[in-house]
């Protein structure tokens, strides 16, 4: 055979016989010479070998599977910049359709003009919702003659809050008034919420799916309390619903729960498309019931690449591929498709909860009957020499990532464990997990020496 190329290494030798494998490639400085694509690919892939399997990660809410067609479509649109509305008008139209679909799903009133935008996730969406509440409160307060500088404005939320709300309050100088959860109220205690509200309250956050346990705040009852409060004062207080987890789940599986724009005092909602919207990270959405709840000064008219567009985002340039992936899912599944997928996921969660309870060692906090989250603690009389941290370690040895952590402040002495069931966790995979779960417990029961901590320090809050 004749060869026309002098450097045969690039096409004859395997990756592991190449010169790149003969030396230690710089890792914290740029290498002197470029590498062939196949070698760079292999080196990076090898770096990731010892990471856990995303499919076995029961700690995350984030989507870990999409159909091949969706993945292909997203990979073909990675180069599109979502901010370039004039350059990619059809992409902008798909985003507009997504906002309209979500507004319809959340029962936005037909006689009002809703507003909405995509974000890189629910954390950014919460920031935008919080900013709108602060600016709207300031305008209302100034109009009523309140000295807005006399003290800091405040935000009311349960202690089951997601960490992005703490960030929001720090970044925008807001006093976060936390309503503590207790054993009788493992979500927002609506009977106490008005004790935390005053004329400096920019809003109350209701959580549709507390990250710790998967439980819902009673948004309907919260609306009733604020309606009572608002009827007696000119200093109106409204609700932002953090539906990062529940916003794309509850409408399909529990449509009778009234939590959305049907409630008078719910004025804005956020959700994560990369959770039960079934898109890879990261994509989020935030909507306002009416344009009057989104102060004009937060909307910027940006001249960019030949066009002018309104924008209300903290971030600027980002790929449009996740917006396109979200629209693909809406088109592909429709209402019935989402309902079928989420109902199956809920069934799997309840199956897991039953299997956990059958061991006799655990008290169940959440059995997957709302969000498909299984959450439990060791019984006080379990009479075992191991902790949930030990169990988490044993499961990790089998590839499963299952978190154990303390509940929020006022309940931090309670250690719980949690599974997040996603669309790609079917009954067969769930059965494999239960077998590993039972085997791990058996190993711990038979272990002669255990090394464990009774508590894990400094771990509170989660990210979207």
Swiss-Prot record:
| CDD domains per record | DOPA_deC_like
Its EC number(s): 4.1.1.15
Q: Per the entry, which co-factors are needed? A: pyridoxal 5'-phosphate
Q: Which GO terms describe its biological process?
A: glutamate catabolic process
Q: What are the cysteine partners in each disulfide bond? A: none
GO cellular component terms, alphabetically, are:
cytosol
MF terms (GO), sorted A to Z: aromatic-L-amino-acid decarboxylase activity; glutamate decarboxylase activity; pyridoxal phosphate binding
Q: Family, per the entry? A: Belongs to the group II decarboxylase family.
The entry's protein name is Glutamate decarboxylase beta
Q: Which gene encodes it?
A: gadB
């Amino acid at each position: 055979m004749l060869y026309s190329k002098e450097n045969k290494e690039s096409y004859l030798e395997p990756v592991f016989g190449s010169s790149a494998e003969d030396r230690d490639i710089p890792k914290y400085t740029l290498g002197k010479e470029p590498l062939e694509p196949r070698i760079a690919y292999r080196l990076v892939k090898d770096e990731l070998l010892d990471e856990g399997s995303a499919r076995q990660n029961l700690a995350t809410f984030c989507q870990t599977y999409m159909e091949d067609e969706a993945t292909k479509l997203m990979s073909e649109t990675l180069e599109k910049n979502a901010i370039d509305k004039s350059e990619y008008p059809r992409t902008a139209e798909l985003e507009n359709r997504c906002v309209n679909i979500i507004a319809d799903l959340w029962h936005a009133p037909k006689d009002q003009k809703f507003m909405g935008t995509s974000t890189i996730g629910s954390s950014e969406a919460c920031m935008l919702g919080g900013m709108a509440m602060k600016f709207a409160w300031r305008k209302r307060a100034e109009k009523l003659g309140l000295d807005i500088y006399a003290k800091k404005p405040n935000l009311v939320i349960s202690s089951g809050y997601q960490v992005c709300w703490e960030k929001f309050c720090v970044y925008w100088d807001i006093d976060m008034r936390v309503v503590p959860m207790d054993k009788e109220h493992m979500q927002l205690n609506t009977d106490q919420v008005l004790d935390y509200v005053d004329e400096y309250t920019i809003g109350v956050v209701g959580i549709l799916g507390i990250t710790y346990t998967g439980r819902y705040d009673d948004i309907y009852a919260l609306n009733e309390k604020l309606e009572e409060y608002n009827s007696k004062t000119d200093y109106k207080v409204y609700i932002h619903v953090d539906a990062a987890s529940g916003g794309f789940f509850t409408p399909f599986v529990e449509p009778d729960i009234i939590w959305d724009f049907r409630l008078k005092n719910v004025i804005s909602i956020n959700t994560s498309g990369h959770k039960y919207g079934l898109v890879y990270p990261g994509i989020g959405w935030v909507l306002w019931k009416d344009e009057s709840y989104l102060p004009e000064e937060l909307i910027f008219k940006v001249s960019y690449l030949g066009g002018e567009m309104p924008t209300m985002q903290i971030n600027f340039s980002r790929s449009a591929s996740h917006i396109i992936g979200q629209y693909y899912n809406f088109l592909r599944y429709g209402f019935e498709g989402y309902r079928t997928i989420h109902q199956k996921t809920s069934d799997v969660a309840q199956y897991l909860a039953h299997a956990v309870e059958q061991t006799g060692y655990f008290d169940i906090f959440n059995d997957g009957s709302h969000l498909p989250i299984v959450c439990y603690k060791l019984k006080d009389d379990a009479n075992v020499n191991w902790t949930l941290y030990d169990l988490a370690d044993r499961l990790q040895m089998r590839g499963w990532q299952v978190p154990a952590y303390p509940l929020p402040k006022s309940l931090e002495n309670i250690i719980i464990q949690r599974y997040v069931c996603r669309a790609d966790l079917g009954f067969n995979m769930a059965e494999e997990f239960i077998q590993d779960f039972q085997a791990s417990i058996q190993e711990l029961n038979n272990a002669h020496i255990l090394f464990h901590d009774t508590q894990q320090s400094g771990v509170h809050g989660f990210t979207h």
